[in-house]
């Protein structure tokens, strides 16, 4: 099973850069890169909420479950 992170898709839809998102969310570029490259083991609800607020989306718009 895998969780797919679609931050790049939402960034493109919102015409927003990774740098701009990191600034709005209040996390480092390194941490945002770990998340968007699907290397993160977990995400805080507060971070997920901030990303959704910045991208004006729902958690399901950026996180997707795919079975093996």
Tell where the protein language model's regions lie, with residue ranges:
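A short, Lys/Arg-rich alpha-helix, primarily the initiator
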Residues: 1-16
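Short alpha-helical DNA-recognition segment
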Residues: 16-34
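Residues within the helices of the helix-turn-helix
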Residues: 8, 19, 49
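Residue-level recognition of specific faces of alpha-helices
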Residues: 31-34, 47, 61
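Short C-terminal boundary/hinge segments that cap the last helix of small helical domains
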Residues: 56-68
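The alpha-helix within a helix-turn-helix
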Residues: 11, 22, 52
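Short, basic-rich loop-to-helix N-cap that marks the start of a DNA-contacting helix
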Residues: 39-50
């Amino acid at each position: 099973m895998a969780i797919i992170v679609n931050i790049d898709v939402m960034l493109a839809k919102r015409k927003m850069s990774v740098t701009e998102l990191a600034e709005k969310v209040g996390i480092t570029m390194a941490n945002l890169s770990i998340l968007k490259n699907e290397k993160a083991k977990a995400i805080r609800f507060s971070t997920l909420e901030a990303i959704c607020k910045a991208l004006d989306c729902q958690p399901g718009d950026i996180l997707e479950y795919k079975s093996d």
